[in-house]
């Protein structure tokens, strides 16, 4: 379709199956010089980062657009108008905070006080991944669409953020407000990679799964590879990692996304911990960083060192918490027979002076320790950024700094999405790669399976007990 169809409709929707040119259509739209910036909203920081990267490659002037998450934009609005848009709940209680934020922003939009400001600020609103909007977010976008021209892009078969309250019905509520402009049907992701057959297969899977049927993984030889699970954890893990290394060896300079358990984040962390060159894609909430900050705020001396080692040990290998604590106690008692290392010196400084600068120095020494591998790079970088920021704001807590870092990432998008990484369908949706490795497709519903199958442009490897999948 041409972008003229977007500009010809003040409100409308485009149904966009995965890999069918939606992102290109959005970027082509943003290339057209506006008289005021475009507002582009999506759901994940990874999606924000991916879109910004595409726009940067196309040299689209940043003055043409403002890209962020829906909640990131809502938070920015609430902070700019705190008296008119009060949010009393702490962001550290996200289950209460974000619904309150959305309700408060919705009320602010409904009272009409910002109508002139919003019309003067943006020329058009584009909302990506619209199938993941809950009803409050849908109401917010609906209010905005009465002020500025609005196009929403989505695919009901990719609706996997449906666990946080009521979702608008796509036919009776979404398309009632945003009539269908066009449905994309050309599998550009795979055509551009020379994998036309895989693209047609993924589109066919979408139709089969949408009708409630299972798909047969043996029907796309050469592109889709089925690997059996035997139900023995260590045996299956060894098989999965052997397959991963085989992909690395045959595609040394190409990207790989490993799609793990959507519920059990620890299982994804353990996979990355025991694998070479696999990083972890983190949720935007960054709970582990907030928990570390909270722990650091409440500790001093050897207890603070213990907290530093504990949380670092959840993000990197070879921390050796118990051994290190015992060694520090030996040093503290003056019984050490071997010289103090630079890491031990940094940790001992924390015992003597629990300053934030000393905490940061200790984290940096842990990172450079021989044999250490940071397998959660985004989380560890955010933790260091948190401590660094907290050093410049001594009147506030480390947890306050963690909240600031998290909202910065939410607003601008996480730019540190690695080329070879593990995540869940929730975290990886909107991303694309050369190859994908699905660790267990047996318990995936139709939507999660379709999202998982449609990430890779060149090959898909699926572990499951049977070659027929799709609950």
Where are these regions (language model features)?
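The feature marks helicase ATPase cores and/or their adjacent C-terminal helical subdomains
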Residues: 1-471
């Amino acid at each position: 379709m041409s972008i003229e169809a977007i500009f010809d409709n003040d409100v409308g929707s485009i149904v966009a199956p995965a890999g069918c040119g939606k992102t290109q259509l959005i970027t082509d739209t943003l290339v057209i010089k506006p008289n005021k910036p475009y507002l582009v909203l999506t759901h994940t920081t990874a999606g924000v980062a991916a879109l910004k990267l595409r726009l940067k490659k196309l040299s689209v002037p940043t003055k043409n657009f403002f890209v962020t998450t829906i909640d990131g934009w809502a938070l920015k609005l609430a902070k700019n108008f705190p008296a008119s848009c009060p949010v009393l709940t702490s962001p550290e209680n996200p289950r209460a905070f974000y619904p309150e934020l959305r309700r408060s922003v919705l009320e602010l939009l409904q009272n009409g006080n910002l109508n002139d400001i919003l019309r003067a600020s943006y020329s058009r609103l584009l909302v990506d991944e619209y199938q993941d909007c809950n009803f409050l977010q849908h109401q917010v976008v609906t209010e905005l669409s009465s002020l500025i021209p609005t196009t929403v892009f989505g695919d009901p078969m990719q609706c996997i953020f449906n666990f946080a309250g009521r979702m608008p019905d796509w036919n009776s509520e979404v398309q009632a407000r945003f009539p269908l402009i066009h449905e994309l049907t050309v599998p550009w992701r795979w055509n551009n990679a020379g994998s036309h057959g895989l693209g047609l297969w993924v589109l066919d899977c979408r139709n089969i799964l949408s009708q409630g049927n299972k798909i047969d993984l043996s029907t796309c030889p050469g592109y889709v590879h089925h690997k059996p699970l035997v139900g023995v954890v260590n045996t299956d893990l060894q098989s999965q990692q052997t397959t991963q290394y085989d992909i690395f060896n045959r595609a040394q300079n190409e990207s790989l996304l490993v799609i793990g358990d959507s519920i059990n984040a620890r299982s994804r962390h353990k996979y990355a911990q025991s694998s070479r060159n696999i990083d972890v894609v983190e949720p935007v909430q960054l709970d582990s960083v907030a928990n570390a900050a909270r722990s650091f705020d409440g500790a001093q001396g050897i207890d603070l060192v213990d907290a530093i080692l504990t949380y670092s040990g959840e993000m990197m290998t070879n921390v050796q918490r118990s051994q290190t604590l015992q060694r520090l106690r030996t040093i503290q008692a003056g019984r050490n027979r071997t010289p103090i290392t630079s890491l031990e010196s940094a940790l001992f400084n924390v015992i003597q002076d629990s300053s934030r600068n000393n905490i940061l120095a200790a984290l940096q020494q842990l990172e450079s320790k021989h044999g250490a591998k940071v397998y959660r790079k985004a989380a560890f970088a955010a933790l260091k950024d948190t401590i660094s920021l907290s050093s410049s704001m001594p009147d506030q807590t480390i947890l306050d700094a963690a909240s600031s870092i998290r909202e910065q990432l939410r607003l601008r998008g996480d730019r540190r999405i690695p080329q070879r990484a593990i995540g869940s369908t929730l975290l990886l949706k909107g991303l694309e790669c050369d190859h994908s490795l699905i660790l267990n497709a047996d318990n995936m519903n139709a939507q999660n399976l379709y999202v998982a199958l449609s990430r890779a442009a060149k090959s898909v490897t699926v572990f499951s007990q049977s070659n027929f999948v799709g609950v």
